[in-house]
Amino acid sequence: MVTSAFQTAQSHRLFAEAQQLMPGGVNSPVRAFKSVGSEPVFIERAEGAYLWDVDGNRYIEYINTWGPSIVGHSHPEVISALREALPKGTSYGAPTRLENQMARTVIDAIPAVEMVRFVNSGTEATMSALRLARAFTGREKIIKFEGCYHGHADMLLVQAGSGVATLGLPDSPGVPKSTTAATLTAPYNDLAAVEALFKQYPSDVAGLILEPVVGNAGCLVPEIGFLEGLRDLTHAHGTVLIFDEVMTGFRLSYGGAQARYGIEPDLTCLGKIIGGGLPVGAYAGRREIMQMVAPAGPMYQAGTLSGNPLAMTAGIKTLEILQRPGTYERLEGLSARLADGLLAAAREAGHAATGNRVGAMFTLFFTEGPVRNFADAKRSDLQKFARFHRGMLERGVYLAPSQFEAGFMSLAHTEEDIDYTVAAARTVLAAL
């Protein structure tokens, strides 16, 4: 926590310098704090559930490196494994025993997975999975959902229209309309909209991709029957069902969202946690589909650093820790304590607020509920969220600098951390 007056002079200086060196001063847009009308604090180190910035401020953090740090930052067992691995080399560009071990671990954890291909990021995973779906089906169209972010590949940078379901338009300059013309969109949790798309294109859809629990519009939870309905529709139309579990994989349960909800997709995209904090991604699924990937099949995909030995080392150790008894019960309990406490604090202070949570993912929305899709989430009071974010930061609590990003719990958090956070929130919310 902040032990003296909140100072950010060094962060301010570094951000001014960074803006002359990198676009916007950052290497991923959300880090710039633009959506909360502020400047970022520059981090010096991380340990457990805490971050320290260059000005000496300590924070309880609920970003977990945007998901990967579920066992806590600098976990001693992960660090020890990496120290042992480093002298053996940082990259080989050749097969390793570690890749076999990591692949087997993923296959054993997720019932729908029979084969795995490792890549370097979530974007690579989703991009490759959609290419594979098209190769397997011989079709071109894909369906995605409004508010679901699947990385920055051109075909996925699509803004949904206001109708029941519309053809996508480019969501970023530089993306040709022709690239997104085959991308169809529907509101999350709207099964009727998906049915309408399949009625319009009954034999044209190669793949349907979604975050089973959305994290990039804030935390959006699937309603009863939604995922089941998607599984039935994709089966009926010969469409590949793809779960983007880059965020939810190994977080909502050891087998991910699909194990928690009992729905088996055809392909699964992974990342974040499976690298233990190092860059990694993977796409995985049924053997008959994965056998299409080169060199076993004709669908080409490659990567210089794919299966990097350090990422495999950190991922193997992280998943080993997550398999221990009581892990997910602890995450569930801590997350419920925080989410319930924040919502109660907001309502006690008279604010319109809604809390969404599944497992170790949560969001406090500054709007009346329910929040079941991206349109609902966009009704949130963003100015109020920005003031709340700043007030919490000044009190030593580091939240995601966007209303539309889920928060994350780690095994390193304590009940004392949660109680401090809720108490800080009460103070901030009372003054908004």
UniProtKB/Swiss-Prot annotation:
EC id: 5.4.3.8
Catalysed reactions, as listed in the record: (S)-4-amino-5-oxopentanoate = 5-aminolevulinate
Keywords: Chlorophyll biosynthesis, Cytoplasm, Isomerase, Porphyrin biosynthesis, Pyridoxal phosphate
Residues with the N6-(pyridoxal phosphate)lysine modification: K272
Pfam families per record: Aminotran_3
GO-annotated cellular components: cytoplasm
Single GO biological process annotation from the record: protoporphyrinogen IX biosynthetic process
Enzyme class, spelled out: isomerase
Organism superkingdom: Bacteria
PROSITE patterns: AA_TRANSFER_CLASS_3
Compartments where found: Cytoplasm
One GO MF term: pyridoxal phosphate binding
Cofactor(s) of this protein: pyridoxal 5'-phosphate
Known pathway: Porphyrin-containing compound metabolism; protoporphyrin-IX biosynthesis; 5-aminolevulinate from L-glutamyl-tRNA(Glu): step 2/2; Porphyrin-containing compound metabolism; chlorophyll biosynthesis
Family: Belongs to the class-III pyridoxal-phosphate-dependent aminotransferase family. HemL subfamily.
NCBIfam families: hemL, PRK00062.1
Subunit structure: Homodimer.
Protein name stated in the entry: Glutamate-1-semialdehyde 2,1-aminomutase
The organism of origin for this protein: Gloeobacter violaceus (strain ATCC 29082 / PCC 7421)
Gene: hemL
